[in-house]
C-alpha cells in the first residue's frame, strides 16, 4: 500500500500510451472510453500502471452537472458558433476547455484492496507535476482557485493563477487520475469562453444557481507559457513527463491496446456515445 505520493509514482514498470498528436479527428469521447478500458486492465493486474497522454482540438468537455443547466442548448449553440465540439464526460465536475495547447495526462493505477484513498491519487499527480516543472523554478500550489472553471481542491496555480485541474475516476478496481495542463495560448481567453457559456445557459437563473455553477473571472486563469514567461509547448511537457516516468521506474515502455482491451474499448465507446446522445439528441 502506498504511504506517500512518491510511492504511487515509483512503479516497477510504467506503460505509456501517447495520444498527444493524433490531430483534430481524435474525438474526446474516445479518451474517456480509453481510460475506463485501462482502469479495467490495470485493475485486473493484466496491465502495469499506465500513463496516457492526450490532446483534443477545440473541444468543450461538460460534466454531468452541466447537463442540468436550464438553457443548456443555448450554451452549446454559443460554443459551436465559436468552432468547438461539445461532449459530456462520464464523471462529475464541470466544463473545461481542451485545445491543441492543452496536454491531458491520465495516470492509471491498480486500487489494490482499496489502498489508494482519494487524496493520495491527487497528491501523486501534484508530485509528478512539481517534478516535471522543477527546471522552471516555479512555486506550484494546490488549492481551489475561486473564479476558475471546474474549480477543485487540487487546482494547480502559480502566483494565484490556475493553469491545471485534476480529477479522478474509479472503475473496476482501477483508478484514473486525470489532469489538464494549459501549456500555451491564453488561459484567460479559455476562461472567458466558459464564462460566456454559463451566461448563455443560465440567463436570468444565475442568482438561483449560485454555488452550483462557478462565477468565472477570466483573470484567475493563465497558461504555463504566460505564467513562466517562456514558450512552453505540449511537446515540452511530454518530454518532461517521459523523463520523470523513466526516473521513477525500472522499465518504461510504449504499448498499444491488446485484443481484449480493444474489445472493451469498443463497448465503452458505445456507452459514451449513448450517454452523449441522451444529452444532445
UniProtKB/Swiss-Prot annotation:
Q: In which pathway does it act?
A: Protein modification; protein lipoylation via endogenous pathway; protein N(6)-(lipoyl)lysine from octanoyl-[acyl-carrier-protein]
A Pfam family (short name) is LplA-B_cat
**Does the keyword section mention Acyltransferase?**
yes
According to the UniProt entry, its GO molecular function terms are: lipoyl(octanoyl) transferase activity
Active site, UniProt feature: 150 (acyl-thioester intermediate)
In the record, the note on similarity to other proteins reads: Belongs to the octanoyltransferase LipL family.
Put simply, this protein is called Octanoyl-[GcvH]:protein N-octanoyltransferase
Which species expresses this protein natively?
Bacillus subtilis (strain 168)
Gene, per the UniProt record: lipL
Amino acid at each position: 500500500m502506498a504511504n506517500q505520493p512518491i510511492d504511487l509514482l515509483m512503479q516497477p514498470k510504467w506503460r505509456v500510451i501517447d495520444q498527444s498528436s493524433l490531430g483534430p479527428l481524435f474525438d474526446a469521447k474516445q479518451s474517456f472510453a480509453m481510460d475506463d478500458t485501462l482502469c479495467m486492465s490495470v485493475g485486473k493486474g493484466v496491465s502495469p500502471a499506465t500513463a496516457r497522454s492526450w490532446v483534443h482540438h477545440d473541444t468543450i468537455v461538460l460534466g454531468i452537472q452541466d447537463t442540468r443547466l436550464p438553457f443548456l442548448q443555448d450554451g452549446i449553440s454559443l460554443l459551436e458558433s465559436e468552432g468547438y465540439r461539445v461532449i459530456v464526460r462520464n464523471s462529475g465536475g464541470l466544463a473545461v476547455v481542451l485545445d491543441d495547447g492543452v496536454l491531458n495526462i491520465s495516470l492509471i493505477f491498480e486500487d489494490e484492496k482499496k489502498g489508494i484513498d482519494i487524496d493520495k491519487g491527487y497528491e501523486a499527480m501534484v508530485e509528478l507535476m512539481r517534478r516535471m516543472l522543477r527546471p522552471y523554478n516555479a512555486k506550484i500550489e494546490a488549492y481551489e482557485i475561486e473564479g476558475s472553471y471546474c474549480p477543485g481542491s487540487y487546482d494547480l496555480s502559480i502566483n494565484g493563477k490556475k493553469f491545471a485541474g485534476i480529477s479522478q475516476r474509479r472503475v473496476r478496481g482501477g483508478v484514473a487520475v486525470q489532469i489538464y495542463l494549459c501549456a500555451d495560448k491564453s488561459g484567460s481567453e479559455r476562461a472567458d469562453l466558459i464564462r460566456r457559456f454559463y451566461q448563455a445557459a443560465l440567463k436570468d437563473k444565475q442568482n438561483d444557481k449560485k454555488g452550483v455553477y462557478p462565477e468565472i473571472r477570466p483573470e484567475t486563469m493563465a497558461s504555463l507559457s504566460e505564467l513562466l514567461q517562456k514558450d512552453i509547448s505540449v511537446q515540452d511537457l511530454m518530454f518532461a513527463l517521459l523523463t520523470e516516468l523513466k526516473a521513477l521506474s525500472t522499465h518504461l515502455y510504449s504499448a498499444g491496446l491488446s485484443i481484449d482491451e480493444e474489445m472493451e474499448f469498443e463497448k465503452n465507446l458505445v456507452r459514451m456515445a449513448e450517454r452523449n446522445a441522451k444529452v444532445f439528441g
